[in-house]
Design a protein with these regions (language model features):
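Intrinsically disordered, low-complexity terminal regions
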Residues: 1-290
């Protein structure tokens, strides 16, 4: 009872904080860091443990308002730089804001995750439901997630491995790698980087991979049913297996369409100043590593 009253008001903690407090189903964790590192891992306890390293004049605050448990820090002169190591229940949704700079790592979550940072990498293993990861000047990496996935960067690469669900990935100046993916809806775009997709092509699925100044590589299962549209201005198209462009399939000099199987899936591959390559599953990544 005493902790609940203190938590609502805000709890001031001293240098090198180490505290544990109970949480309940239905609550979510919200972490804000002005600069430093945020590492969140899962455990089976119905509690959150916060270990933080910070300056002697900085204060870490833990507060509860409604269903949100908030962790932040401040000092006498404004925001504080803190390094966090946090243990939280796997079921607990997580939101992290790192402004202007924070490196964020989350592992073992079985809940929704939202991360946004300006200058710092974002690395997540796990996650269920809505997954939204953003970094302006850092790489974004996601492994083993299931759900609705949105990944964004401006000056960094995006890597997605062993994930399933709808996927949207966009960056300006970076590569996009989508490996071992199970999805019926993929939209990946970059301006100055290549795109690699190795995953399922499901019947009635939608797949759009576009780059302005980079190569686009996609794996195509042997029994895929897809209508494939290819567009490249100054690059080339190459397939590791025979494809036939039917009469009328080439609409312009730089754009054509062909069909595999029943053609129920829609696959759009575009690169203005790069090449487009299509191979069987596993071949694309092996060739790119050589």
């Amino acid at each position: 009872m005493l902790f609940a009253l203190v938590a609502v008001a805000g709890m001031m903690l001293n240098q090198d904080t180490d505290t544990t407090f109970a949480v309940r189903q239905g609550q979510r964790l919200d972490v804000s860091d002005f600069g430093g590192t945020v590492v969140i891992k899962s455990w089976r306890q119905s509690s959150v443990r916060v270990r933080a390293t910070h300056g002697s004049r900085d204060y870490v605050t833990v507060s509860t308002e409604g269903a949100t448990v908030s962790i932040g820090a401040s000092s006498r002169h404004g925001p504080a730089m803190v390094d966090y190591e946090i243990l939280a229940p796997a079921w607990m949704p997580i939101s992290v804001s790192g402004t202007p700079s924070a490196e964020v790592t989350i592992e073992g979550s079985e809940a929704e995750i939202a991360v946004e940072t300006v200058e710092g990498a974002v690395t997540v293993v796990g996650g269920r439901g809505n997954i939204e990861l953003k970094s302006v000047e850092g790489d974004v990496s996601l492994t083993g997630a299931k759900g609705h996935i949105e990944l964004n960067s401006v000056d960094g690469s995006i890597t997605v491995k062993d994930c399933s669900g709808d996927i949207t990935a966009a960056t300006v100046d970076g590569e996009i790698s989508l490996l071992n993916i199970e999805s019926s809806d993929v939209d990946a775009s970059t301006v100055d980087g290549g795109i690699e997709y190795d995953g399922t092509i499901t019947d009635s699925g939608r797949y759009r991979l576009t780059s302005h100044d980079g190569d686009v590589s996609v794996s195509m299962p042997e029994r895929a049913n897809a209508t494939i549209s290819v567009a490249t201005f100054s690059g080339s198209f190459d397939a590791c297996f025979p494809v036939t462009i039917p009469p009328g399939g080439r609409t312009t000099k730089h754009r054509f369409t062909f069909t595999l199987g029943t053609g129920s899936a829609r696959v759009e591959l575009e690169s203005f100043d790069g090449s487009i390559k299509m191979c069987r599953p596993g071949q694309i990544h092996e060739q790119n590593e050589e």
